[in-house]
């Protein structure tokens, strides 16, 4: 038996390593905008990388509120600047083509403040402001010292500043706010139904789309080539299954929020799928490249599809008959998706499991108490498989203000074997361990990490379910599979109760230490007590929505059963440190601030811990931060070069130190900024080297450092934050060091009591050469184990910055003290285990540079939108030319032909022997007589006006051989009509026949 297990281990271990790579959150990929990150499943506002299709990424702050994505972009004008000449302004996003496209696709706003410190001569002055999209605004002096302008849409994003006069001291000083762009989704790119795209089978390609659904167990997409088909399905909310292979845990995919899928083909006979920022999943090799056929990607989701591939968005997602490689079959659906509380999850295992963040009247509050136990115990909590191992199907939602705590501890013993499981969290990691004991103990585990940690006083749902080798841990939307690994540590896992039988589950704590005598039954203590040090401590906080064996459990009923089984006096409501209902703060705390007990005692008041937002508690229980008053650490600004600030003694524990500072432009010699001391020795100090390296020195040789850019005008943040140790091991006491987005772990700085803080002023001349301190503070939290009743053992903060202000002899110029940009201090959205992963912090704001004329954006000339515009203009131009041609041939040319005969034609008519002038009369021509010369009428003198033939226009009617001489405007309104025979012209004019003339008669008005 054991030999077979050993033979199977290498193969199983290889498979585990492959699956493990799938379960770890990957690095965040750069995307076009914050909206694209939102479509990739990111819901927490944070600093994220964005880039164009061929540009280097820039890190900007992304804000997600109520399903709306905002992109926050800073510029060099956030620091005040006097405009002394034509200047151009750079932004966090270096690629201006990408930045302009972002502004075009979004609704952006920016505020410009113009300050006239000196009145212009003659009361006149002004400047032109040109936006990123080349919109110009003229600003003139109006008599007010300060003018504010709100720019939006195409006017947002100040790019150029052009003053009326260069090098004029009266020119204004300008500042701008951040450029905030609200993304506007394209309705043309939203698909409800089925979408197909044809791709080349033997070429490298990738295609991206986003999807949103609340239904699991459905087909996500299929790849079809000839007679072969590969199908990818969503299963059991968290899993992807390709072609019937083993399901792969990814994330909660049926949560009615957007996720992004990228299908790739970049290796022979291999196709890959990438979901959000998780590692790629290799699909089955059912489709071969040995063909010249086309691969059809067919996307069909019972929900919504968002087209985000560049081949779609560049054409505004418009398709017609000329693009047969993409086909859309939309369906009309009025169904509303289920979002949030009440939406079922893992319905194949649990009955009515859902994630609800609302307060619940059935919630229970657990406290850490030196005299009393704190947990919920449930008997018969697991089903048992044929091998004697538990099949867990347990879940609860918890919230805690502590960064360490026990969530579940389960155990089972039967004829076939025994085992234990434990789910607990410490700082930024939740871990699950599952051990089954037959001959030897075999354990599997996995962990889920969060950059925000899990002690943030917010509801977190934890689920453990499965059996055999398929046991999974889910924390909110994250999931991992427990696997057998060689480096699993069981030091923090509680032991199986030795004499307990059956299967039981502890929630929120366990019987890990002796408590006050007389409260608990001796047989219960003997049954469950483990006589070892404390490991994962009690979950200090609240629990609700407890599921055991897949069904929701009435915690009140279970707690009553627990008291009957374990208490000497079952009616003693204070025997356990457990209370119904979850305590809250009044008024409610702001977002990002924890509601906590002020002291370790059970009845202590609840307050907001303002240090979470680097603020200070007031006597009214609210949070406050004094107005930003920078202090320059220079002898030119401070009355002393060494300032010692005393700290009052306290029984509380130093939990956080923070320092906001701006660097000088140039450092001539190394400088000690601040030193933290006890009465005996220096605890730690913060130093600045000449190259901009900030060095934190702890206990002599233990140091941590990071080099900063001296040209960066932004205010930096240094934080030291205490990690609560697991159990009672002092060697586990650590502090987290943050310098902006950089993070490392250092040794304990609180071994001795902090008594004073020493601040050093350097011998510098001005603000540019000095360290500028914007804030300096300390935070304390109560000690849970010692001096519990001492009045100083409470949560409080110390404002050291305010204690520095009395030593300031003159205030620095605020325009030279740095830019406050809290996005520089943001923690990353995800925690990665890769040491090579770059620090993800916001990019520099850029600089104000000499005027640089913007060039034409060449890629726009090739975009689908510009092609459509060009085609439309071309069609209009062709129609206009066609109309001109038709007008010329049908109207203008016939008129010109009637009016333009040559003089030679007129001469031929006049000199012809057939020429015989006639006089047209006003009256009726009924009684016409014919003269001897064959003309109508006999008075030749009436025709003298027509002898000058060239002064008349002539038209010859060839059918009747009649010429009409039309007089010009300066001749009498009479005409001569000549009829010619078809015979050859001779010198002798034939006699006129006496019958009626065939020439037409024209009545002419002589007037």
Swiss-Prot record:
InterPro entries hit by this protein: ConA-like_dom_sf (IPR013320)
> Which ranges does the record list as Extracellular topological domains?
27-865
Q: Which GO terms describe its biological process?
A: nervous system development
* Highest rank taxon of the organism: Eukaryota
Keywords noted in UniProt: Cell membrane, Cell projection, Glycoprotein, Membrane, Neurogenesis, Signal, Transmembrane, Transmembrane helix
Question: Where would you find the membrane-spanning parts of this chain?
Answer: 866-886
Instruction: Name the membrane topology term.
Output: Single-pass type I membrane protein
User: Which residue stretches are annotated as topological domain Cytoplasmic?
Assistant: 887-1007
Residue numbers spanned by region Disordered: 980-1007
User: Does Membrane show up as a keyword for this record?
Assistant: yes
Functional description taken from the UniProt entry: Maintains the normal guidance and termination of axonal branches of VC motorneurons. By associating with cell adhesion protein casy-1, mediates axonal interactions to establish synaptic connections between the male-specific sensory neuron HOA and the AVG interneuron. Plays a role in regulating male mating behavior.
Protein family membership = Belongs to the neurexin family.
Subunit structure as annotated in this protein's UniProt entry: Interacts with casy-1; the interaction establishes synaptic connections between neurons.
Q: What is this protein called?
A: Neurexin-related protein bam-2
Organism whose genome encodes this protein: Caenorhabditis elegans
């Amino acid at each position: 038996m054991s030999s077979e297990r050993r033979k199977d281990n290498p193969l199983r271990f290889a498979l585990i390593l492959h699956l493990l790579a799938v379960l770890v959150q990957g690095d965040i990929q750069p995307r076009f905008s914050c909206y694209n990150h939102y479509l990739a499943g990111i819901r927490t506002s944070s600093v994220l990388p964005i880039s164009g299709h061929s540009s280097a990424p820039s890190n900007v702050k992304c804000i997600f509120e109520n399903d709306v994505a905002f992109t926050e972009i800073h510029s060099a004008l956030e620091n005040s600047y006097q405009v002394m000449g034509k200047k151009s302004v750079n932004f966090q996003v270096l690629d201006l083509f990408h930045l302009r496209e972002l502004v075009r696709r979004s609704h952006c706003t920016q505020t410009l403040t113009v300050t006239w410190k000196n009145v212009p001569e003659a009361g006149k002055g002004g400047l032109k402001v040109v936006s990123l999209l080349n919109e110009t605004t003229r600003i003139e002096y109006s008599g007010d010292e300060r003018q504010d302008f709100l720019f939006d849409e195409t006017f947002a994003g100040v790019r150029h500043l052009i003053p009326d006069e260069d090098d004029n001291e009266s020119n204004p000083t300008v500042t701008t706010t951040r450029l905030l762009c609200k993304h506007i989704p394209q309705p043309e790119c939203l698909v409800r139904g089925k979408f197909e795209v044809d791709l080349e089978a033997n070429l490298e390609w990738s295609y991206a789309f986003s999807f949103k659904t609340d239904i699991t167990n459905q087909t996500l997409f299929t790849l079809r080539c000839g007679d072969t088909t590969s199908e990818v399905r969503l299963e059991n909310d968290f899993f992807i299954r390709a072609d019937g292979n083993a399901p792969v845990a990814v994330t909660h995919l049926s949560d009615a929020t957007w996720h992004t899928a990228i299908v790739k083909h970049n290796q022979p006979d291999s196709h890959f799928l990438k979901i959000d920022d998780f590692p790629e999943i290799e699909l089955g090799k059912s489709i071969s490249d040995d063909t010249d056929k086309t691969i059809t990607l067919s996307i069909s989701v019972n929900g919504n599809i968002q087209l985000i591939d560049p081949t779609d968005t560049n054409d505004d997602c418009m398709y017609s008959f000329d693009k047969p490689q993409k086909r859309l079959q939309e369906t009309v659906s009025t169904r509303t998706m289920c979002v949030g509380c009440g939406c079922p999850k893992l319905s194949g295992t649990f009955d009515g499991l859902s994630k609800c963040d609302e307060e619940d009247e059935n919630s229970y509050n657990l406290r850490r108490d030196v005299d009393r136990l704190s947990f919920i115990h449930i008997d018969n909590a697991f089903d048992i498989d044929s091998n004697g191992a538990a099949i867990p199907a347990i879940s609860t939602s918890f919230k805690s203000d502590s960064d360490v705590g026990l969530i579940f501890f389960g155990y089972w013993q039967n004829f076939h074997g025994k085992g234990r499981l434990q789910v607990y969290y410490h700082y930024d990691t939740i871990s699950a361990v599952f051990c089954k004991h037959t001959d030897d103990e075999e354990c599997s585990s996995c962990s889920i990490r969060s950059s925000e940690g899990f002690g943030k006083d917010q509801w977190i749902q934890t689920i453990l379910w499965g059996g055999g080798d398929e046991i999974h841990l889910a924390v909110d939307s994250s999931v991992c599979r427990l696997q057998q690994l060689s480096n699993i540590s069981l030091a923090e896992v509680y032991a199986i109760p030795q004499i307990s039988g059956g299967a039981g589950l502890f929630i929120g704590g366990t019987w890990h230490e002796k408590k006050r005598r007389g409260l608990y039954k001796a047989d219960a203590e003997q049954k469950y007590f483990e006589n070892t040090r404390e490991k994962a401590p009690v979950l200090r906080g609240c629990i609700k929505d407890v599921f055991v064996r897949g069904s929701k459990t009435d915690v009140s009923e279970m707690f009553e059963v627990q008291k009957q089984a374990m208490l000497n006096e079952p009616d003693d409501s204070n025997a356990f440190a457990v209370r119904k209902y979850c305590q809250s703060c009044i008024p409610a705390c702001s977002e990002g601030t924890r509601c906590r007990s002020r002291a370790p005692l059970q009845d202590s008041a609840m307050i907001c811990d303002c240090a979470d937002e680097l603020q200070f508690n007031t006597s009214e229980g609210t949070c406050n931060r004094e107005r930003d008053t920078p202090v320059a650490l220079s002898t030119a600004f401070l009355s002393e070069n060494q300032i010692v600030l005393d700290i009052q003694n306290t029984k509380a524990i130093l939990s956080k130190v923070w320092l906001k500072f701006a660097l000088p432009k140039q450092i001539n010699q190394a400088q000690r900024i601040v030193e933290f001391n006890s009465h005996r020795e220096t605890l730690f100090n913060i130093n600045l080297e000449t190259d901009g390296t900030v060095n934190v020195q702890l206990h002599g040789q233990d140091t941590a450092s990071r080099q900063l850019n001296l040209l960066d005008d932004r205010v930096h943040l240094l934080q030291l934050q205490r990690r609560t140790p697991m159990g009672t091991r002092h060697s586990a006491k650590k502090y987290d060091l943050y310098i902006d987005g950089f993070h490392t772990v250092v040794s304990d700085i609180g071994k001795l009591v902090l008594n004073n803080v020493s601040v050093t002023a350097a011998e510098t001349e001005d603000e540019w050469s000095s360290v500028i301190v914007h804030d300096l503070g300390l935070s304390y939290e109560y000690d849970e184990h010692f001096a519990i009743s001492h009045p100083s053992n409470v949560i409080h903060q110390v404002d050291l910055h305010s204690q520095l202000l009395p030593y300031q002899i003159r205030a620095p110029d605020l325009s030279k003290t740095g830019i406050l940009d809290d996005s520089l201090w943001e923690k990353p959205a995800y925690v990665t285990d890769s040491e090579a992963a770059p620090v993800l912090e916001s990019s520099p704001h850029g600089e104000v540079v000499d005027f640089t004329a913007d060039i034409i954006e060449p890629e726009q000339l090739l975009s689908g939108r510009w092609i459509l515009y060009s085609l439309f203009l071309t069609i209009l131009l062709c129609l206009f030319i066609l109309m001109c041609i038709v007008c010329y041939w049908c109207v203008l040319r016939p008129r010109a032909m009637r009016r333009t005969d040559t003089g030679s034609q007129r001469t031929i008519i006049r000199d012809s022997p057939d020429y015989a002038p006639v006089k047209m009369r006003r009256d009726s021509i009924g009684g016409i007589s014919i003269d001897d010369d064959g003309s109508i009428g006999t008075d030749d003198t009436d025709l003298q006006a027509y002898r000058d033939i060239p002064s008349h226009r002539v038209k010859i009617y060839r059918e009747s051989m009649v010429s009409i001489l039309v007089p010009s405007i300066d001749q009498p309104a009479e005409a001569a009509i000549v009829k010619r025979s078809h015979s050859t012209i001779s010198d002798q004019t034939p006699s006129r026949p006496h019958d009626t003339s065939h020439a037409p008669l024209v009545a002419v008005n002589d007037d």
